[in-house]
Each structure stands twice: as C-alpha cells, then as structure tokens.
C-alpha cells in the first residue's frame, strides 16, 4: 500500500502511441486549473527526446511538458528511469537524472529489481506534498512476456497501490478487441487494478459507439470513463518520440523550405516544432531512401544519440553529397548538438564511448574537431545569439568537446562562455544549444534573414493555449462523476 496520502491514478494503454502522454498532460492542466497541487510521474520512459529538469539531470521531454501542464517545477523524480536507445538493442540508462550505465535488452531485464527501488523512492518524493499524482505507463500491460520484474506498468501499479485507467485508441481500429483482449490476458491481480477505461481519438457521432461501450462492459465489467475526441490541440504540443515523428511529414506550405534529414538515432527533434508551427515555413523531414530537396533554403542537422554511427548512415544515404551540393548552391546549414559535431572535420572517440570506431571524418563544413569525453554536459542555459543579437533560452545535453578555428566565431554566448561555431561566410552554423528555435526573437531573426518578415507567434504561449484547450476538452468529454472523484 502507498504510504503517501496523495491521490494517484495511472493511465496505461492497450498499446504504444494511444495518447497517454497528452491525456496525462491534459488532466494535469485541468487539475492545476482547479487549484490542486498536481504532479506527473512516469516510472520508465524510452526516448531520445530528453529535457533538463529544473533540479538538474535528464528526464523525458514528455514529463517536462506534463510538469508545465501541471504548473509545477520539473524534477528528475518525475521520470526516474529514462532509457535512451543508442543501438538496435542497447540503451543508455538514466536513473533519477544521472547516467547509470548501458545495457542491452536481456541485461536490462536483470537490472529491473534494483531499479524498482529507485522508482518507488521517486514516486514517494513526487507524491509528498501533492494533492494528486497522475502516472503514465509505458507501452502496454498486456506484454506479459515482460511482466516479470516490470517497473513501467502493472509491476509499479501493484507495488505502489495505484489504480489504473486503461486507454484505448479507436482511431487505429480494433479498440474493442484491444480492451477485451487486455482483460483476457492479464493475471487476476493485475486485472483487479483496473478501475475503468477511456476511449481516445474518437471522430464522429459518439452515440454510434454506445453498443461498443455495452459490449466492453459485458466482456470486462469495466466502466467507461469517457470517450475523448481527436484533440486538435495536441498537434501544437512538442513531439514526444519517433513514433510521432513518422507521421510528421511536413509543416506548412510556406515560402521557406527547410529540410531535416531523419537520422536513425535522432534526438531532441522537438527542437524543430517551433519552425513547424510557422505558416510561412515548409518543414520537410527527409527519410531513408529520399534525397535532400534541391530547393531547400536551409538544412538542419538535428541532435543524435550516436554521432559517429549516424554520420556513417548519413553518408550511406548519399546525404553528404546532397549537402555539399546544397552548400555550393548557396544554401545554409544549421547543426544542433550531434548535428553540430558532424559538420566538423573529424570526430574522435579515443575511449570508445560510442562504440568501436575511434575516429571518423566529419562533413568538413566547419573547421572544427570534436573529441568525445565521458562526462556529460547537462544543464539549462541562458544565451544570446551572436548572429541576430537575440536572447536564447535552451538546454544542453551532450558528450564531447569541440574546438577549432571556426569556434573563434561563436554562434552564441551561453552563460558568459562561447558556444558553437560559424563558417567564415556565415552560412554554416553549429551549436550545442537545444531549444534555440523556441526562442521567439531568434526564430524571428533567422526567418527574417531569409526575407520572411511576418509577425512571429509566441511559441510558449501557443503551447500553453493548447494545454488549456485539451484540459477543456477532457472536462467536457470525461465522466463528470469520475472526474469529481479524481479531482475532489
């Protein structure tokens, strides 16, 4: 049983990408709007989209967004285990904000009993002083092959004594089968943790699903806590993970085309969301087998969890030749974090931090070299752009030190120190600062340099408005009796 007196509820899904993250964010904002002290919590997240929490250390960007929705400072305790994939079957493990180690799938399973203690400790800290904690599961509790030692779904819920609401995605089809199938496959103790379910992403006349609700209740005995429509405001929230990225074909059909090569281990690609939100920008995600568009004015190389292997893939795709042609045509390039490292002459990894390749040539567009180092830089930062004399607010999460002649032309001054590099002609820029496009003045300066002089929206305000809209939709479409019990 939970020692804390804070109320808690856990949203688990019938599968991945059913909308748990957005629902948790919406419920956090709804509770905060009613004056409650509410906090989000996710025992285990797998994502290369990380944030720097307000108390230092890494958490998933989704939990950072949920803390924003809750109007509460973010904390490493809100996402005690973060897995950052860096190979096909291996991940870096972040525990309570700090690097714990690396492990492949089977090795990680053996670590779970140890990690459960950290998860429960973090949950107690998050719950202390809160009125309500809203917990997000990962994947699906129906993955019974992973039930032993589970810390992400029912393993956590049963140990912490937190009731579960199951979320099903009707948009992808088969929602009745997924809910009833989950009921059928769960062990009795896990099944007893489920208080009810929510249908998410519904389109059309809700009354057409009345028979579906009755059928689900007949098979499972679970009540329906609401049928939530497709939440349009969710499109204005930062993208969470690569599942979402697969659907982000482009932004608007605007005058400025910006191309973004999608690397296998792309990280922190929500850096691009503010650009995607601009109506006069067309943001094109270039996937495997595609060419970097010849008519792109700007190419952005995003962050990477594994710079050296992603650089090899970049070349294998022929994107290095595309990029050289782009530069010869007068095009511009921005590299962020791992993308910045790729733009240099050489990447050295003498300690083999990223694997077996000890050094590899870069793309040669900046006169810099990077050496990987074991100590990771993790911090929120205030900066100023040297290009547009614009304030920047962002964060740094990176391994490695970059030096070279082009660093004498820094792209930003971060916390009083130089960061990044500019080519002599100013057309190639690199930086370690994530979040720079979310700084409205910088984004305005960048777009103005391409001849786009329209008024720029306040990106943070747009996210806040989206959260309020989602909270309002949940208040309208969730069972008022269930909400009353949850929110007091």
From Swiss-Prot:
PROSITE patterns: GATASE_COBBQ. Residues 255-442 form the GATase cobBQ-type domain. One of its GO terms (biological process) is cobalamin biosynthetic process. InterPro entries: Class_I_gatase-like (IPR029062), CobQ/CobB/MinD/ParA_Nub-bd_dom (IPR002586), CobQ_GATase1 (IPR033949), CobQ_N (IPR047045), CobQ_synth (IPR004459), GATase_3 (IPR011698), P-loop_NTPase (IPR027417). The active site is at 337 (nucleophile), 434. Pathway: Cofactor biosynthesis; adenosylcobalamin biosynthesis. CDD domains: CobQ_N, GATase1_CobQ. Coiled coil: none annotated. Catalyzes amidations at positions B, D, E, and G on adenosylcobyrinic A,C-diamide. NH(2) groups are provided by glutamine, and one molecule of ATP is hydrogenolyzed for each amidation. NCBIfam families: cobQ, PRK00784.1. This is Cobyric acid synthase. The lineage of its organism: Bacteria, Pseudomonadati, Pseudomonadota, Alphaproteobacteria, Hyphomicrobiales.
